[in-house]
Amino acid sequence: EPFDSPLGTGSGAAVIFGATGGVMEAALRSACFLATGSNPDPDAFAEIRGEKGWREAQFSLGGDTLRVAAVSGLGNADRLIRALLHGEVQYDFVEVMACPGGCAGGGGQPICEGCELAGERGGLLYQIDAANPIRFSHENPEVQRLYQEYLGHPLSERAHHLLHTDHTAWKMPSGVNETGQTREFALQ
């Protein structure tokens, strides 16, 4: 009997989750397949890649134009949220990475004498993706098996219940500042 694969089979799409825009790109690859029945070129959504803290792009997906943005760094996330709230921008899909450059630039990464290597690391993730024989999340045999044996099909009731979440606004907790005054935190 073959050994278990405790970490599973990875796809190139999974690898690029560590770079800003990677989660979006992986999702768009599979969304294109689900919408059209055929895979796009794996690099069709490369326009969203890069080190810029706020990237925008438009893609045609199944005859519709999809407006997307990917931001990294909390300052850029704040700018994006404010622009959305003020109606300055409109997107169909947004990715936010807290760390500049995505997880490749996160606090758990080694620091090289103060050099910022997130862009270089992100580039390496895309090289690993390009070399992977499985470039699409939906082609991962373990993901396919999970759907066949348990979830049913993408967007099935069970898959939706277990894999999707909804978000509604919540009131931020009260805080006490250095003068002892209580204040409410709220997005301005």
Which ranges hold each PLM region?
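Iron-sulfur (Fe-S) cluster-binding modules
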Residues: 1-188
